[in-house]
Amino acid sequence: MDIRRASDRLETKISWLDSKHSFSFGEHYDPHNTHHGLLLVNNDDIVLPGAGFETHPHRDMEIVTWVLQGSLVHQDSEGNSGVIYPGLAQRMSAGTGILHSEKNDSWRLSGERHSDPVRFIQMWVTPDDSGIDPGYQQLEIDHELLRGGLVTVASGMPRHRDQTAITIAQKNAALHAARIAAGNSVELPAAPFLHLFVARGAVTIEAAGELTEGDAVRLTDTGALRVTATTDAEILVWEMHTRLGG
């Protein structure tokens, strides 16, 4: 069990962006902190209104974006576009190569101007195979989250094939999310590798103690642990059944 506090994260901060990295990213490199299981990136990004990431390339990566506040506009070279907001998950398969941009929407869904930043978590996992076709999918799951349990957001695992979830091209990984009311609990799946990130609030985990916003725990070969919210909380959990290099 490896607990990583919010203050331990690497950070990129410029005029329009505050990005906190759970793993090595960009100019920040730590050879002892490159991934956990199949997860290479878990970035906690805050982007100011009217700003964002201009068109840039990706290749051979499954990228899942989860918005916590505000709205984010996506456009890519495959002709896909969409506005992502809390409760709507997005997956982009980079495959043989894709160009895309991500920007703070600068508009509320009502069409009114606003001055709010957008905060989102972007997560990258490796695909089963390189050189697949680029792809895009988004899915509204806000209703499922209201139930308070662990919801499968994205998965390539055969057992989730019949569930309402975004598909990813990685048969050994699944992303789950939960919005947990204070005092309530969820049970984590048992897996060789788990990564739990506290996106909001605070939780306690069996054998790990309390985690607060921005904290994470990396679990290896643990059973099904119980997570209890000490305040209203939102968590993101990667379940992985192998690691990079097998």
Segments (PLM) and residue ranges:
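Jelly-roll (double-stranded beta-helix
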Residues: 1-246
